[in-house]
Amino acid sequence: MENLQNYIDKLNKLNFKEMYEGDFFLTWEKTDDELEAVFTIADALRYMREHNISTKIFESGLGISLFRDNSTRTRFSFASACNLLGLEVQDLDEGKSQVAHGETVRETANMISFMADVIGIRDDMYIGKGNAYMHEVVDAVTQGYKDGILEQKPTLVNLQCDIDHPTQC
């Protein structure tokens, strides 16, 4: 594509409005238009960066990363994406948090969400656990938002779970 307007024109032809304020759990839950929009936006961001056009959509904010398994590519890709959009990354180390002392998923999820715009989770160690855990986190922050505890509900991005790895599809 030659210019940014071409990406905008392409996006205007796609139906991806349901993704707004939504989470990204599983690749196969997305429509063809939604997946095409993800790739088109990625291409547009790449174009903007290559042409020295700011990609920052946040003046400040946090991207929380939670890696329950070792990671190199996914960890640095998430950090790079957050930085590209204007977010600071804070890694949640469960061993150094109150989770280690029995704090519940609901308590932890709501606490880290006070200033978070996005939460990226990689939990792929045990079959039947990772995706379920991600849904538990989203359910907790959704309820926190509905109850007025949270000013906003952060978006959850599945960085890899036991059944999908959308960031490397």
Residue ranges of model-derived segments:
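Positively charged, low-complexity intrinsically disordered leader regions
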Residues: 2-76, 80
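Phosphate/diphosphate ligand-binding glycine-rich loop within oxidoreductases
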Residues: 56-169
